[in-house]
């Protein structure tokens, strides 16, 4: 796969502003930063005496991070680009993309190349390298369903390591890289398996409604139709980070056991829920937050978005600490009313 630039000496950027590298727009600063354009540059910094002993943070699109303070260490800005069909067989295409590739642009490219499968994940902010960390998902599809493998550099040693799905240990918005592997690796390339026998995922009510509104027969739907529908839905519901700082969905949809759900539904008969294959039930965190009266409310310059209660926004001038205080207040109220603990999606630093 082509990379954005060849291995070369890495220039260090002292006292570097991260405002343009996080979608909340917080003006945190890094003690030092480096732009990384190849796996070899990640590896070289493992042995570089200029940054010996510094904590390290890999940043892609910055759409899943809340800076509550400056970062007193080395921030590695992943700019590894490139995307290509690396092989195919009778059943599938295998496509690889660099960790610094924009996720949405990559999804659009796969469709333009006639390789559908990722269209339900359109317009999710961030980079390809961040997608496995979070096991991103939307509208009935999780990234892990099309994941083949990834390559990552171990930051402490510079070793290039290959991960299959089992080693990644994917869960709901979760993976090895958020647990035991947190902060240890930089994902430099991800390979996806896209089956040639394409089946549309249009079971979500929002997607079905959008397709119907466009006059598209579900029996004749194309991957591009699903892509366009998802993009339209997300643009209608979610604020553009360039206009209003945010990190997308701030809370995970909680999953509870069937007994707890039965008790909850007895008190809240109109609760929004989604049965899971293992017998548990996923709840809509946005509905819980809305019922607690938080939708559209603000604490200072941090607020809950008026159209989507899952999204916390920076109205202008908010700090990471302000957003975190708002998140804690929401979690407290949801726990008090429903007995359900919300888990935050972004990493708070």
From Swiss-Prot:
<keyword id="KW-0521">NADP</keyword>
<dbReference type="InterPro" id="IPR011601">
    <property type="entry name" value="MurB_C"/>
</dbReference>
<dbReference type="InterPro" id="IPR036635">
    <property type="entry name" value="MurB_C_sf"/>
</dbReference>
<keyword id="KW-0963">Cytoplasm</keyword>
<keyword id="KW-0274">FAD</keyword>
<dbReference type="GO" id="GO:0071949">
    <property type="term" value="F:FAD binding"/>
</dbReference>
<dbReference type="InterPro" id="IPR003170">
    <property type="entry name" value="MurB"/>
</dbReference>
<feature type="active site">
    <location>
        <position position="173"/>
    </location>
</feature>
<feature type="domain" description="FAD-binding PCMH-type">
    <location>
        <begin position="26"/>
        <end position="197"/>
    </location>
</feature>
<dbReference type="GO" id="GO:0008762">
    <property type="term" value="F:UDP-N-acetylmuramate dehydrogenase activity"/>
</dbReference>
<dbReference type="InterPro" id="IPR006094">
    <property type="entry name" value="Oxid_FAD_bind_N"/>
</dbReference>
<keyword id="KW-0285">Flavoprotein</keyword>
<dbReference type="GO" id="GO:0008360">
    <property type="term" value="P:regulation of cell shape"/>
</dbReference>
<dbReference type="Pfam" id="PF01565">
    <property type="entry name" value="FAD_binding_4"/>
</dbReference>
<dbReference type="GO" id="GO:0071555">
    <property type="term" value="P:cell wall organization"/>
</dbReference>
<dbReference type="InterPro" id="IPR036318">
    <property type="entry name" value="FAD-bd_PCMH-like_sf"/>
</dbReference>
<comment type="pathway">
    <text>Cell wall biogenesis; peptidoglycan biosynthesis.</text>
</comment>
<comment type="function">
    <text>Cell wall formation.</text>
</comment>
<dbReference type="InterPro" id="IPR016167">
    <property type="entry name" value="FAD-bd_PCMH_sub1"/>
</dbReference>
<comment type="similarity">
    <text>Belongs to the MurB family.</text>
</comment>
<keyword id="KW-0573">Peptidoglycan synthesis</keyword>
<dbReference type="GO" id="GO:0005829">
    <property type="term" value="C:cytosol"/>
</dbReference>
<feature type="active site">
    <location>
        <position position="345"/>
    </location>
</feature>
<dbReference type="Pfam" id="PF02873">
    <property type="entry name" value="MurB_C"/>
</dbReference>
<keyword id="KW-0961">Cell wall biogenesis/degradation</keyword>
<keyword id="KW-0133">Cell shape</keyword>
<protein>
    <recommendedName>
        <fullName>UDP-N-acetylenolpyruvoylglucosamine reductase</fullName>
        <ecNumber>1.3.1.98</ecNumber>
    </recommendedName>
</protein>
<feature type="active site" description="Proton donor">
    <location>
        <position position="249"/>
    </location>
</feature>
<dbReference type="GO" id="GO:0051301">
    <property type="term" value="P:cell division"/>
</dbReference>
<dbReference type="InterPro" id="IPR016166">
    <property type="entry name" value="FAD-bd_PCMH"/>
</dbReference>
<dbReference type="InterPro" id="IPR016169">
    <property type="entry name" value="FAD-bd_PCMH_sub2"/>
</dbReference>
<dbReference type="GO" id="GO:0009252">
    <property type="term" value="P:peptidoglycan biosynthetic process"/>
</dbReference>
<keyword id="KW-0131">Cell cycle</keyword>
<keyword id="KW-0132">Cell division</keyword>
<keyword id="KW-0560">Oxidoreductase</keyword>
């Amino acid at each position: 796969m082509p990379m954005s630039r060849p291995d070369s000496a890495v220039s260090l950027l002292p006292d570097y502003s991260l405002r343009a590298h996080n979608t909340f727009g917080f003006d945190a600063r890094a003690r030092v930063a480096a732009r990384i354009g190849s796996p070899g540059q990640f590896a070289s910094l493992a042995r570089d005496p200029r940054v010996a002993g510094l904590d390290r943070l890999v940043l892609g699109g910055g759409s899943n991070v809340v800076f509550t303070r400056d970062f007193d260490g080395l921030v590695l800005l992943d700019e590894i680009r490139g995307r290509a069909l690396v092989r195919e067989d009778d059943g599938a295409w295998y496509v690889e993309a660099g960790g610094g590739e924009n996720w949405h642009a990559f999804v659009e490219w796969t469709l333009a190349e006639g390789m559908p499968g990722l269209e339900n994940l359109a317009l999710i902010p961030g980079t390809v390298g961040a997608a496995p960390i979070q096991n991103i998902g939307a509208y009935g599809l999780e990234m892990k369903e099309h994941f083949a493998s990834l390559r990552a550099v171990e930051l402490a040693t510079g070793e290039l390591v290959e991960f299959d799905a089992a080693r990644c240990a994917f869960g709901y918005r979760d993976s090895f890289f958020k647990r035991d592997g947190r902060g240890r690796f930089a994902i430099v390339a991800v390979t996806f398996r896209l089956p040639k026998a394409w089946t549309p995922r249009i079971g979500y009510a929002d997607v079905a409604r959008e397709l119907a509104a466009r006059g598209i027969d579900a029996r004749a739907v194309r991957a591009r139709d699903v892509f366009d529908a998802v993009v339209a839905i997300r643009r209608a519901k979610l604020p553009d980070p360039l206009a209003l700082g945010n990190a997308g969905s701030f809370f995970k949809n909680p999953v509870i056991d069937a007994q707890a759900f039965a008790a909850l539904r007895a008190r809240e008969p109109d609760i929004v829920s989604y049965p899971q294959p293992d017998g548990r039930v996923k709840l809509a965190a946005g509905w819980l937050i809305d019922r607690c009266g938080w939708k559209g409310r603000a604490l200072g310059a941090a607020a809950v978005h008026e159209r989507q209660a899952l999204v916390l926004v920076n109205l202008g001038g908010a700090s990471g600490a302000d957003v975190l205080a708002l998140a804690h207040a929401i979690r407290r109220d949801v726990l008090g009313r429903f007995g359900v603990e919300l888990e935050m999606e972004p990493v708070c630093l």
